[in-house]
Amino acid sequence: DGDFDYVSKGDLNGNGLLDAYDIMSVAVALNDGVSPRKVENVAGEVTIEADKKQYNAGDVAVITVSGKGMKSVNGLSFALPYDAQEWEYVGVEAPALGQMYNMTYDRLHTNGDKVLYPTFVNLGEQPNIEGDATLMVVKMKAKKKQKFALKHTNGMLVDKHQNVVLF
């Protein structure tokens, strides 16, 4: 994939992606940086569910990303690969993520893979995500009649000290 050089320069955790972990390394230094005070290590469970199992052409899938037991979440990201012949990215809403900067990117890779990368990070010292919440809602438009079969990969929650929980 011709994206390797682009990704490799900023891929600090070596997973082949520019994700919340990599972005957090810079984001914690912005806007006067983050407080050195100790926080609990990041924790939480994330679930991703569509509103229906079956979609007709033109239907919009509402994909809810929920967090349970969130602690010290300063950034999060995941990848959602999809077939551009079957789905079209419509948008993402994330009111529960407060001041987090939305770096979501709908990317067509040089090898033809289409992947949505919902990515949110705090810039500098901002409130963390704590507790249970609907983290975001991703909307995808079906281009044909189909069952919902999209699966996320490379999900992570990151705290301001770059501790990580994978999902």
PLM features: what roles do these ranges have?
Residues 1-2, 112:
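Active-site-adjacent bridging/hinge elements
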Residues 3-19:
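Acidic, divalent-cation-chelating loop motifs in proteins
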Residues 8, 20, 24-167:
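Acidic, low-complexity intrinsically disordered segments
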